[in-house]
């Protein structure tokens, strides 16, 4: 688990003691990477060579395929030091996602920061659409709130029409009041997250991640704040 040591407070949601580490129990972890895309891929929306197809469902708790292969497969340790670790995952393109790729993920502790880096390398013979997402989970409290520069999202006004819309005018979103599953556009790469009255943190991205996804489901004791390169339902929206 990832904790604030001096106060023994969970930063990421702790893995349940009554669960075993397994492929499908990644759903209950405190963090995972989403590669080679973030979000769901609905039926007949994935466009290899401009032919729209469906991908196989990849998780028993989800109605459609979601978040790619990285979050439900083992990663190999390629490097390790006393304050960092590098993990590698290779997908051969033969099952579900039809392209081969190599993902690399590093975790580094520096002063009071956890630095997570993800890279994605195309090792297929063909070009393909891809994306990256950082998917941490946090425990919800009455104080949980995200301060960010943009709460602009794509709002569906007709079956085939989307427009940019602001969810709220202020720069603070109350995670108890707003129960949403939405990608916010034009993120400037820096947000302040208040988890509870004793714990807050700064989420930063140096470059190339322009969206911030907020998942705050009703009647649940958790939420997710996710820096992502592609918006939710990206292939459906593109189609």
Regions found by a protein language model. Name each.
Residues 127-129, 137-208:
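Active-site/ligand-binding surface loops and adjacent short beta/alpha elements
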């Amino acid at each position: 688990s990832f904790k604030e040591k001096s106060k023994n407070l969970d930063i990421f949601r702790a893995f349940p003691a009554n669960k075993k580490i397994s492929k499908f129990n990644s759903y209950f972890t405190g963090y995972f990477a989403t590669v080679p895309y973030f979000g769901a891929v609905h039926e007949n929306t994935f466009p290899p060579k401009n032919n729209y197809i469906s991908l196989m469902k990849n998780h028993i708790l989800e109605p459609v395929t979601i978040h790619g292969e990285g979050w439900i497969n083992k990663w190999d340790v390629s490097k390790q030091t006393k304050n960092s670790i590098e993990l590698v995952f290779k997908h051969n393109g033969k099952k579900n996602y039809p392209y081969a790729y190599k993902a690399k993920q590093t975790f580094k502790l520096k002063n009071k920061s956890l630095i997570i880096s993800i890279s994605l390398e195309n090792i297929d013979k063909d070009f393909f659409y891809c994306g990256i997402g950082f998917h941490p989970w946090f425990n919800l409290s009455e104080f949980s709130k995200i301060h960010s520069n943009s709460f602009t999202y794509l709002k569906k006004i007709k079956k085939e029409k989307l427009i940019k819309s602001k969810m709220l005018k202020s720069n603070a979103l109350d995670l108890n009041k707003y129960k949403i599953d939405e990608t916010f556009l034009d993120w400037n790469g820096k947000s302040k997250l208040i988890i509870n009255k004793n714990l807050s943190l700064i989420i930063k991205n140096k470059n190339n991640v322009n969206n911030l996804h907020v998942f705050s489901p009703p009647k649940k004791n958790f939420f997710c704040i996710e820096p992502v390169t592609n918006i939710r339902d990206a292939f459906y929206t593109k189609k």
